[in-house]
Amino acid sequence: MMTTTIFLFSITSAVAIIFALAAHILPTRNNDGEKNSPYECGFDPLNSARLPFSFRFFLVAILFLLFDLEIALLFPLPAASFLTHPTTLILISLAFMAILDAGLVFEWINPPLEWAE
């Protein structure tokens, strides 16, 4: 068991070192204006790509990622039913869903998420 772990750790470390050395040794490409410009479906960009975008859009994107992560954390719960007592699993699931619901209610009530002013 321990020799397998040491062997796999050695192999992954060697591969990581080889990739790091290859990235350092291989030449970098020349950066020209075309490579550094944003691509917009073959059209010339109308505005600068470095303009700030709406903070509300950023907030909605972050909230979407948080809810997506919370839903992804719910997926292993059916597999955990074989590992723990069913009552414990139900309590954990209910607590997790309560946190998810509380976050949804907070975001629903929170004024920064309203688009119309």
From Swiss-Prot:
Main localization of the protein described in the UniProt heading: mitochondrion
Subcellular location: Mitochondrion membrane
Top-level lineage group: Eukaryota
Topology versus the membrane: Multi-pass membrane protein
Function: Core subunit of the mitochondrial membrane respiratory chain NADH dehydrogenase (Complex I) that is believed to belong to the minimal assembly required for catalysis. Complex I functions in the transfer of electrons from NADH to the respiratory chain. The immediate electron acceptor for the enzyme is believed to be ubiquinone.
Origin species: Paracentrotus lividus (Common sea urchin)
The protein's enzyme class: translocase
Full protein name: NADH-ubiquinone oxidoreductase chain 3
EC numbers: 7.1.1.2
GO molecular function, a single term: NADH dehydrogenase (ubiquinone) activity
UniProt keyword list: Electron transport, Membrane, Mitochondrion, NAD, Respiratory chain, Translocase, Transmembrane, Transmembrane helix, Transport, Ubiquinone
Chain ranges passing through the membrane: 6-26, 57-77, 89-109
Similarity remark: Belongs to the complex I subunit 3 family.
Catalytic activity entry: a ubiquinone + NADH + 5 H(+)(in) = a ubiquinol + NAD(+) + 4 H(+)(out)
One GO cellular component term: NADH dehydrogenase complex
